[in-house]
């Protein structure tokens, strides 16, 4: 399992998890489906995208 914990400027916590199944990672944000990726590099790219979308000033 891959996990990244993010906090926004209001102190809200966002848990981003990648759970392995059938050779791929299902990416969830606070236990809600986000996407499916093939490896840790793609997971890290998804985390960066989540930061851009949800933490933009």
Label every model-predicted segment:
Residues 1-2, 52-57:
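Short intrinsically disordered terminal tails
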Residues 7, 11-48:
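Acidic, low-complexity, intrinsically disordered interaction modules
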């Amino acid at each position: 399992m891959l996990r990244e914990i993010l906090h926004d400027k209001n102190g809200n916590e966002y848990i981003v998890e990648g759970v392995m199944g059938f050779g791929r990672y299902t990416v969830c944000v606070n236990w809600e489906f986000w996407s499916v990726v093939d490896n840790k590099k793609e997971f890290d790219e998804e985390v960066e995208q989540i930061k851009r979308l949800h933490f933009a000033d």
